[in-house]
């Protein structure tokens, strides 16, 4: 059993009520993020490859990388954040590493990831 206080553990479990799809590094995902502009709120999509995932209960996070106008953009999202509206898995990537930081140095065809074929 973990050394966390039972009250803290109960609160964290309650806040982790959001249904998050199963995804892994190498997968291409679309994250819908709530953005507040002035007095209105809208959803902004961020689509890219998951290059890292951190599983720490309520403090879980994942990093998504995409190329926008020839510039690499990475964004780290807290999995259970209220600002993250939804996560949709577009395609499954077949990779052997947990952290795909090597993609930062690659561009073009060498940065492609094989698709995982369903069995």
From Swiss-Prot:
Function comment: This protein is located at the 30S-50S ribosomal subunit interface and may play a role in the structure and function of the aminoacyl-tRNA binding site.
InterPro entries, per database record: Ribosomal_bL19 (IPR001857), Ribosomal_bL19_CS (IPR018257), Ribosomal_bL19_sf (IPR038657), Translation_prot_SH3-like_sf (IPR008991)
Species assigned in the record: Chromohalobacter salexigens (strain ATCC BAA-138 / DSM 3043 / CIP 106854 / NCIMB 13768 / 1H11)
Membrane-spanning intervals of the chain: none
Name of encoding gene: rplS
Keyword presence, Ribonucleoprotein: yes
Protein name, per record: Large ribosomal subunit protein bL19
Protein origin, superkingdom: Bacteria
Pfam families the UniProt entry points to: Ribosomal_L19
Keywords: Ribonucleoprotein, Ribosomal protein
């Amino acid at each position: 059993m973990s050394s966390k206080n039972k009250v803290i553990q109960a609160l964290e479990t309650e806040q982790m009520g959001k249904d998050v799809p199963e995804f892994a590094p190498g997968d291409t995902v679309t994250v819908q993020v709530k953005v507040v502009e002035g007095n209105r709120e809208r959803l902004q999509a961020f689509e890219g490859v998951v290059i890292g995932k951190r599983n720490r209960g309520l403090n879980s996070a994942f990093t998504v990388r995409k190329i926008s106008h020839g510039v690499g953009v990475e964004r780290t999202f807290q999995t259970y954040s209220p600002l993250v509206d939804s996560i949709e898995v577009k395609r499954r990537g077949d990779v052997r590493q947990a952290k795909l930081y090597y993609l930062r140095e690659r561009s073009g065809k060498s940065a492609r990831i094989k698709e995982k074929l369903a069995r």
